[in-house]
Amino acid sequence: MSEALERLIDQGVGREPADIVLKGGRFFDLVTGELVASDIAISGERIVGTCGDYEGREEIDVTGRIVVPGFIDTHLHIESSLVTPHEFDRCVLPLGITTVVCDPHEIANVLGTEGIQYFLDSAMETVMDIRVQLSSCVPATHLETSGADLPVGRLTPFRHHPKVIGLAEFMNFPGVVNKDPVCLAKLDAFQDGHIDGHAPLLRGKELNGYLAAGIRTDHECTSAEEALEKIRKGMHILVREGSVSKDLQALMPILTERLSPYLALCTDDRNPLDIAEQGHLDNMIRTAISAGVEPLAIYRAASISAARAFGLRDRGLVAPGWRADLVIVDSLENCKAELVLSAGRRVTDALFAGRKPVEPVGLDSVKAREVKAADFGLPYNEGETSVLGVLPGKIITEHRRYRLPAEGNRTGVDLDRDIIKVAVIERHGVNGNHANGFVQGFGLKKGAIASTVGHDSHNICVVGVNDDDMALAVNRLGEIKGGFVVVHDGKVTGEIALPVAGLMSLEPYERVRDTLHHLRQAAFALGATLEEPFLQLAFLPLPVIPHLKISDRGLVDVDRFMLIG
């Protein structure tokens, strides 16, 4: 018997003092639903004792507090926080998020395997446990230009890395159902691991075929009816509440104790400003309980059910033998983390300071050609023009059709109906593609907003009222090596540089948060009415989410999975 195992047993039995003992509080038993008054003994990374009195080398008074298992975000793109994995760690771990299951899909689309390796290297050094799903759809579709291509042979060398769980969200659901050979090769290679799903509005027998391929989770449900069908068919539903995609309210009816073993929580895409102002999974928990969800249901979804869905069998309960990922909160309802333990370590500034840094990658990833105002013109169309219809708080965009006014021999914007221009410019140095269109719902009355964050291939996406400002915004992105830019009347009125693959900042998250606040104000000054104009801009080029999108190759009818202009 190893000395380490003997030590765990001795401290659990009480033969010797535990390394840490939480004294005087109660813990939330997610099996029985009870609040149990008890000391909690910890040895190294593991809980070794509950339901009794213990002595510890270090004793922490948690009188009047409640101890709950650490929270698990089951699907997110860390890149959407606009900070590096190290800064994300420092940003959300103090809120109680002790494990995240991330898909480095964004950086993989820009840098390929170099981006995945960067995330794996970072995950080995962070305090929180970052688990990585291997990006399954790079490029996401044939309807856009990506900076990389990841066939199955480039993914399999990573599959046995200690931080890898399996295959990330399989977005090309038409490819699965229609037996695309490239899709099937990836699915076949990961049949013995976890395969994450992505199946918005997929129902009936097509859903059956998708699930028959071994896919087990979905974070794209936007209605309780859709979620229930998927639960009936064996899926774990990851209830999402991000900065743009907000599905928690719609899925409240399924957040019950009965269904909680088949539910988990995720954020998908959440920026540091929202994290600072509202929180992360802790905010989801507060929101759900205030709306009438039973605490047992939502806390299960935040921990034990999430862990089981992804095969993380060592965490999710406050019980002997389980990983000491613990959050000490003031109350179940408020869910305010007062102390966090990650693998038995107190989360402090000193703990973060002791991490080994990881060198950033992709610092010269923006290779777009310089554009001119004339590049944004579209020939006048006397008939109806397809227009992307933005829905606040949703990444689904409607396919709308309008007769638009003429500006000389070009089609013009229609501010009375909130219709402005949108364009996508290829920025990986592959082909120089440039596609133009129209979008409704941003509220802009002047100026332009541009971004190198444009799911999923992360080409440049720009919306604007006049061509000169659009051109300036796009060209400025090249100068700052990626990020967000706001322009009005020929002047840059706001910007944030994201030089790591054009997706993430090298600055501390506090500075990113503050800069993003000023950037949002600059967008509002143009008339923007969306709560998250930059993240909604970033989803306009996403051709795997219905109904009409725009890529560097043109307008995409997602329902028919084809280019239409």
Swiss-Prot record:
Belongs to the metallo-dependent hydrolases superfamily. Adenine deaminase family. One of its GO terms (biological process) is adenine catabolic process. It holds the Pfam family Amidohydro_1. CDD domains: AdeC. This is Adenine deaminase 1. Its EC number is 3.5.4.2. It comes from Rhizobium meliloti (strain 1021) (Ensifer meliloti). Disulfide bonds: none annotated. Keywords: Hydrolase, Manganese. The keyword Hydrolase applies. InterPro entries: Adenine_deam, Adenine_deam_C, Amidohydro-rel, Metal-dep_hydrolase_composite, Metal_Hydrolase. NCBIfam families: ade. It catalyses: adenine + H2O + H(+) = hypoxanthine + NH4(+). GO terms for molecular function: adenine deaminase activity. Its cofactor is Mn(2+).
